[in-house]
Structure formats: C-alpha cells, structure tokens
Design a protein with these regions (language model features):
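Basic polycationic patches enriched in arginine
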Residues: 6, 36-39, 62
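Serine residues within intrinsically disordered or low-complexity segments
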Residues: 10-11, 15, 24, 43
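Short hydrophobic targeting helices and cationic amphipathic motifs
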Residues: 36, 43-45, 53
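N-terminal nucleophile
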Residues: 59-263
C-alpha cells in the first residue's frame, strides 16, 4: 500500500489489480533481502514488491531485447544507482554488440533512476533517438517526484507508442520522500501507461537486465554508508562482467561503471 504522506500527492493509489494479484504465475517465493522476483522472461529477472498486471502483450515484443545490467542499492544513509555501459541486442538468444557508451543511470533532485530494456524512442517524425537524450531533456529544470517524472515521460512518448505498440521501458528507482526517508520502487512505461511495483523502505537492492552473474540475496545493512555502497556497486558490476567474460563467448555486460548517489 502506498504511503501518500511520503509520495507525491499527485501519485495515484496502486490499482486493485496490482494490490490483489498475488496469485500471478509470475510470483516466486520471497528472497532474503525482502523483495520478491517478478519474471519478465526466463532470462531476465528483476526484484519487485508487486507484479505488473499487463503481461499479455504479444510474444514478438520480447523477441528483440536490449540487454543491460543495472541496479539500485538502498540503506538508511542513501541510495546508489549503478549500471554497466554496454548496449546489446538479443534476438532468439543471440546477442549483438551495439555500443559501450550508453547512459543508463540518471539523477533528479530527489530520485535516481536506472533503465534497462528498450532504449530507442521514435518521435512524431519517426526518427530514432536514444532514450538517454529524452530522459536528460525532461530532467533539465525538472522539479517534482519520480512519479511526476514518469507521468511526463509517458506523455512525451505517446508518438512512439502509437507506432510501437509493444515496446516497454523498464526503470529501477531510488527516491527520497517528503519525510527525508529513502525508498525504492520499479516502474514500467508502455502504451498502457505507467505501472508501479509499489515502494519499499527496506534496506536492500534491486537489479534489472542480464543478471545471470549478478549477486543473489545480497544483504545490505540498514546503516551501510553511502561510500561503502558506492564501492559495493563497483564490485558488483566488475565481478558480474568478469564472470561473464569467463563463461560467455559474448558478454552483454561491459563498458564503464556508471554510478549516481542520492544522500
């Protein structure tokens, strides 16, 4: 259940479907860090506190996936958003390298977002533009909560969704509420609107994208300092990349480590 005193007053209560859909086949057993796992597909998992209700989009929407590795860490001391910088397309299980300079972590006044999944936006002229440019443009001079931000993003992308009906844009969020408390949340932006997992104020972490070699059931002490979380994020991405290099002919995780801090 949302705490309206902590989140923006303009933010809606979660839909009844989100609150009550605890029997979805996408649910897994709770994990030690207090979050549950929502299966986007067998190869891509992300920790969530509630399932998204709209998972009946056509299968072809997932035949081509933009592979990333991103995450957020949360303690009572602050939030760390992190990611690699590699962009790869996966089609029928085969990865194709695109670039090692893709920005995936962004910071607003009171929130950090990390994005994975689709990262190309088509405007009214149907010319492609990197998602990072759209996000940076909206963030310039933006004042408001993360939910205000995503509502604005969805409106901005209406032209895209009118011609790309099945595209989904995924985000991990770390935020500071009106009481100064730190929380995490996830959302998905699609033609159906903006869907939220529901906020959590527990110390812990969320990751998204290609997670086969990432940490599982990582424990984040409630008093872990921001500096230590920053170093931990660097270790997480570095070790994930190293293990992938050992095991895979092509590693979809790579490039420079990106980190943003909210404290």
């Amino acid at each position: 259940m949302y705490n309206n005193n902590r989140l923006a007053k303009s933010s809606p209560e979660p839909s009844k479907a989100i609150q009550e859909n605890t029997t979805s086949p996408h649910w897994c057993e709770p994990v030690q860090n207090g979050f549950r796992t929502f299966r986007i597909e067998d190869s891509f998992q992300t920790g969530m506190t509630a399932p998204f209700p709209h998972d009946t989009m056509e299968k072809k929407a997932r035949e081509v996936t933009i592979v990333s590795y991103v995450g957020v860490l949360r303690s009572d001391e602050g939030i760390i958003g992190f990611s690699d910088s590699r962009c790869s397309y996966q089609n029928d299980g085969v990865c194709q390298y695109v670039a090692d300079d893709v920005k995936k972590v962004f910071k607003g006044t009171d929130f950090i977002i990390a994005t994975y999944g689709a990262n190309v936006v088509y405007g009214e002229d149907q010319k492609p533009e990197r998602l990072e440019k759209v996000l940076d443009r909206i963030l310039t001079g933006f004042s408001g909560t993360h939910r205000d931000f995503f509502e604005k993003l969805q409106v901005t992308m209406r032209a895209h969704f009118s011609s790309h009906l099945n595209d989904q844009f995924h985000f991990l969020i770390g935020f500071r509420d009106y009481d100064g408390l730190f929380g995490t949340e996830e959302c998905r932006v699609s033609r159906l609107g903006v869907e939220y997992s529901g906020p959590s104020y527990e110390s812990g972490y969320r990751t998204g994208g290609y997670q086969h070699f990432g940490p599982k059931d990582l424990i984040i002490p409630f008093n872990l300092s921001v500096e230590r979380m920053r170093k931990l994020a660097e270790v997480i991405v570095d070790s994930t990349e190293r293990m992938g290099n050992l095991c895979l002919d092509y590693n979809p995780v790579g490039g420079k480590v990106q980190i943003e801090v909210l404290s």
